């Protein structure tokens, strides 16, 4: 497989055809070496339009959904980002190219350990990796952007409270086979609005049933 040709086809045939045109996003995807983040058994499918299985019943998002996630958040180079669900680490790498600091958390130690090794290999230094539940974070921590990589049954208000004013959050909500990707924008400490981006289905975020959510 010619990696650069496959990467270029993925961007042209999957991301661009799904309205991902932001050049900074496309360049972040290009630089992040997706082939390094897929399981060995799926190396030949690294650039395919499919959800690649990971351990613990988790999956990589398709490239086009990853692209839309990145573009919808309108990331800025001076922002601090929270990624909920490290997973394969590919999206973590993409976020690192578009932010000042990316804090990525996962409850599965294998995911954060493997991602740390891969990011070190790529010489990515602006990522903090933690093995913990999102609701175990310091209550005083607030982020300009939150990217949630697995689906939730509904919006959890506690996640919105982690956003700074004017902060944005990407989240997929619902139950299979009906889910939708949302962009949440926080206006003030109490006020926020949501925009429906597209319909999709992705695996639930690990541990979503561990806490009773405060849902709206």
Predicted regions and their residues:
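Class I SAM-dependent transferase core
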Residues: 1-82, 90-94, 98, 111-117, ...
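Conserved nucleotide-cofactor-binding alpha/beta core module
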Residues: 74-193
